[in-house]
């Protein structure tokens, strides 16, 4: 069978020689047969063992290599095939391989298999008898140099790169100066302003052209046109290129001189020959103003002091009318009923506008901030009073204006304040007293309605609408609660104590317990010394127990059961020791509960029994050197840190809350114990002080849990609630002999933190922990008495807590003392610019002190105080919070203001009244405290005088000549008069009086003064000398 062979596209009939199989291959490679045979040595030889080991290692490496290659092929065979049969793609100037898909991979594998099959057949000689005949096309001559393309079956056309056509950018070619010149030419013809915007917002230059008479002059918009007065208004580098361009289109057609430059010329660019007084180096002058008669250029940097002296030539009238037009057009009425015609001139309109402004906002300068801001601080009543007063003072001028502008009559009548419609002010004030201080929503709404009713006709329509809405809400509330009067009562309140004890993981951890099961403090015990060192007292066993049995507080006392540590073996006495001393048992009341959003917070309430009665505390027996924690179930007794084995400690009065932080220390990690104790000692204790409120203590506990989160689950010691004295007692290991207190349910630090919430409603968060300090009233009076002799403290009270000065109304002597030392006048001046109502109160006290100085009887002075207290109390109702004691002062004023009326009612009904005797005793007490303060003040003054005289005399005798002694004596006499407020005569000095005869260096001083017998010495007054000698002892002789 004849076959034809094709060379590319050209067939050929040339017979091919039969293929022969090559049986012998000549190669230069070394085959396995040509290699020397390996002889395996005997295992017993010295060479065998290394060979065996190396062979095994080589086989292991080859095996691992084959396994790796097999794993690699299995894992990456798909990616390799995709890359192998992928296409070369050129895109964006890059050439990369585009991976083939599954169909392309299958097609490629099939093609490879066909090629491999052909090559195998060809190498095996299976195609020896195959003859391919080809055809040669006539006319083709290879000799001509023509190329022959042999295209195989696997040929494919290559991708052609498509050229992208680039669109050339059209760039306009123009000269910038020419463009800007044309813009400025247009601006000069129509007086159009031009803005040149820089790279930043504050780099904008505003310029343009202005008509001055018949001339066209360029100008710059300067910063002082916007009331921004700076040293240099235009930098020369910024406008150096712009000034010549602006000057090109300047046309001066008038004769100008330097004297003609006045207001309105600010910013104009004038030639140097016109602004002849400008002594600057510029050819063109940018007018800013005049300084010392010379025209100043805006590019010149002036000193800071000369900026205010410069008379700037900006046109204020233009800015005024620009603002007037803008504001007038914004407030034009929405409805237009007619077509407006201009009938009057601008002068008429200006007078009308000025009249309306002065009636509504009387002032001296509209540009003055003080004149404008005083209306912001005024109340509506004060504003109405000011308008009435101003209209009365300027009634003649206003009547003349009304004749010219009849419409002003309606304006004046509307601005006139109207009389208060409510004539029953007494009832309104009584409502204000009843609603004062209540936080209930309904009471606050009633107070708001009452304040609107007091205003009467002066109330605005919005206030009347608010009052109607509040009245509707109160009516709905009363309608909803009329049938459920008992809702919210404590009849159904139950807060039983949990029967299960709280689990504290820190006390149950085996790693923190010794072989006896006791808690191991570790490093916590070492760092707890910071508590015991400064805020705990050491208890002496035995007779020392009696000293700590009574735990005193200013408002009450409690007995500890520390005496029961001495146990008697008499059964009867022991049974007697188990009886406590019971206080008055108070029933369940609103003081026992705390609420949030109208719901009970049970952990912040007192514990009750099943029937709703409160759980009263029984006797708490003492233990020795223990910390007792746990409020539910049986208490947990933890040994105190073993700092000293035989010592017992008790917290100082006012610091019993430290037992809470000591209990929290149990849950602190040992590595954080140092930080915990230092934070309590350095931050918490100084912040809380003695006898803090429960809210402050809970806030401090929250701070500690924020830094040490594990303390939130710490168990607390038992806390007893004394509602009579408003106190909470933290029970320590010495227990409590006093019984009958309520028990607080909070058992962990997290539960105690609820008292820190401002949303918590209840009285217990204001209770003192550990007792109550001095009453707030007594603290304020004590601070007031001590401030009379301490000017810095007095100034601090006036600035920070001015209500303390109102407490002077408890005694006529205090009011007169504050008036004499100028405290009341200083307070009135200080507060007149901050709160006029506070200043008015001090003015009332000044008038009261003047009236009381004329009264001879104490009862008459107290009557004046009672009458003044009513006025002060009424004024205080409209004050804002300006101090921490406003509520305390308000209660005090309400008490003394109602005292006089209550005494009258008692006298009418025939009851005896001891208020006069009470006032007499109180006045003696206050006068005594004031006299003691004055005595201390005089004592210090005399001591300082003695010290001054001794030092002055010693320095004078050593340094100055004898002839100047007379002048020195006069100076000492004047100093004594100024300091002691009386003439002591000519002072003399006697060494034998001022020095002790028995002093060791007395003879030395005698010899010294004998040598200086010509000198005159100062004799100290007898009282101060003896007092100083007693205070300083032997140092006085030195």
Swiss-Prot record:
Span of the annotated motif Involved in interaction with stylet and aphid transmission: 365-368
Residue ranges occupied by any Peptidase S30 domain in the UniProt entry: 170-313
Top-rank lineage group of the source organism: Viruses
One GO CC term on file: host cell plasmodesma
Site residues by UniProt (Cleavage): 313-314, 770-771
Alphabetized Pfam families for the sequence: Peptidase_C6 (PF00851), Peptidase_S30 (PF01577), Potyvirid-P3 (PF13608)
Motif (Involved in virions binding and aphid transmission): 622-624
InterPro entries in the cross-refs: HC-pro (IPR001456), HC_PRO_CPD_dom (IPR031159), HC_PRO_CPD_sf (IPR042308), Pept_S30_P1_potyvir (IPR002540), Potyvirid-P3 (IPR039560)
Coiled coil (residue ranges): none
UniProt-listed PROSITE patterns: HC_PRO_CPD, PV_P1_PRO
EC code(s) of this entry: 3.4.21.-, 3.4.22.45
GO MF entries: cysteine-type endopeptidase activity; serine-type peptidase activity
Leading EC class: hydrolase
PTM statement from Swiss-Prot or TrEMBL: Potyviral RNA is expressed as two polyproteins which undergo post-translational proteolytic processing. Genome polyprotein is processed by NIa-pro, P1 and HC-pro proteinases resulting in the production of at least ten individual proteins. P3N-PIPO is cleaved by P1 and HC-pro proteinases resulting in the production of three individual proteins. The P1 proteinase and the HC-pro cleave only their respective C-termini autocatalytically.
Catalytic center residues: 224, 233, 266, 656, 729
Family matches, as Gene3D superfamilies: Helper component proteinase
Domain comment, as recorded: The N-terminus of helper component proteinase is involved in interaction with stylets. The central part is involved in interaction with virions and the C-terminus is involved in cell-to cell movement of the virus.
Official protein name in the record: P3N-PIPO polyprotein
